[in-house]
């Protein structure tokens, strides 16, 4: 089965929904596909409030922001196909292959493509890391915030970036005991506003430490604890500093890597940008890649905050609509300048400045 559309947006997270809404505002025909059973992406896991300025949704919870964007896309007539995987890209003009509900295939022939496929959690290999009970922080967040399922009784979190800190606090909100946070660096890695919450809650902080081993329970059905140790200035474990921490869940929060599978299939040029999570598609200020008509936005173009993903989605949506002749150059420039003003504000400070430089 074949389908023609003006703009295909792959991914219905913060970036993808924003791109779709922005393009549809100018009259573009937009199809959004997502492998999940509802749109919103990571926003529906985020029960915490955004902070910063009102322009950047300060005081709004991610879950509420996701709901608002769904209402907007419905009003604009954006078509959304859920439970749908984009699994193939054919540069010879045959289109983008989609698996629809796992039962039938569909080839979409879009004039423009916006890839907003997000990022995946990084694994951390150590003895016992494949045991039940060693869980990614994102999976923990999904269980407690989306499905309302307790992940365990006592959690040890490995990694103190924003994800590790936020999920730790959300575990406490869910009534789950936290055994501590383990961080190899000499200080916590995330924003002070998140670090302050876990400090005030009395969570033990093992900075300058690493996990050595997950200790299995008697029948190997899970974990009963972890062995951690101090590290030297080369991040190597210091013999004799090992200690046992009792827990039945070990959360892994050691960063994210952009999902570049589809850009790779499309033969988009990739560049190494460690501050953005590894290889990312090269793109210009319109979020257009080295392949004309293919745009990227959000974490798939470099890992940042959800607020940045929203703004990048807007840029891609405006640019795609302009390329289709839905918006004149002057109006498009004004709209993009407003978005860039917002993005530049987000990419300031000790964390944002590094991402700003990497994007440049």
Regions found by a protein language model. Give the residues of each.
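Residues forming the flavin
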Residues: 1-360
């Amino acid at each position: 089965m074949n389908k023609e559309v003006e703009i295909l947006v792959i991914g219905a997270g913060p970036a993808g929904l924003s791109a779709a809404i922005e393009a549809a505002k100018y009259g573009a025909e937009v199809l959004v596909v997502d492998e999940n059973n509802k749109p919103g992406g990571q926003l529906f896991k985020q029960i915490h409030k955004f902070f910063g300025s009102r322009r950047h949704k300060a005081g709004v919870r991610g879950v509420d922001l996701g709901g608002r964007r769904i209402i907007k896309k419905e009003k604009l007539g954006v078509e959304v196909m859920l439970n749908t995987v984009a699994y193939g890209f054919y540069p010879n003009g045959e289109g983008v292959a989609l698996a629809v509900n796992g039962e039938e295939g569909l080839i979409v022939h879009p004039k423009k493509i916006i890839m907003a496929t997000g990022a995946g959690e990084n694994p951390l290999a150590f003895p016992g890391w494949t045991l039940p009970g060693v869980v990614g922080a994102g999976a923990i967040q999904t269980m407690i915030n989306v499905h309302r399922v307790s992940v365990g009784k006592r959690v040890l979190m490995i990694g103190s970036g924003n994800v590790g800190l936020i999920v730790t606090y959300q575990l406490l909100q869910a009534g789950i005991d936290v055994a501590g946070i383990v961080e190899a660096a000499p200080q916590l890695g995330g924003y002070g506003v998140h670090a302050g919450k876990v400090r005030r809650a009395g969570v033990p902080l093992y900075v300058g430490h690493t996990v050595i081993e997950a200790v299995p329970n008697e029948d190997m059905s899970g974990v009963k604890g972890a062995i951690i140790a101090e590290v030297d200035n080369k991040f190597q474990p210091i013999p004799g500093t090992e200690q046992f921490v009792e827990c039945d869940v070990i959360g892994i929060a050691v960063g994210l890597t952009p999902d570049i599978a589809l850009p790779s299939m499309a033969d988009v040029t990739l560049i190494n940008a460690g501050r953005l999570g590894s290889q990312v598609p090269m793109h210009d200020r319109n979020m257009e890649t080295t392949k004309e008509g293919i745009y990227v936005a959000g974490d798939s173009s470099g890992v940042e905050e959800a607020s940045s993903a929203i703004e990048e989605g807007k840029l891609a949506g405006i640019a795609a609509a302009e390329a289709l002749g839905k918006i004149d150059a002057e109006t498009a420039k004004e709209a993009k300048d407003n978005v860039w003003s917002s993005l530049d504000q987000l990419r300031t400070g000790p964390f944002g400045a590094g991402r700003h430089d990497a994007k440049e």
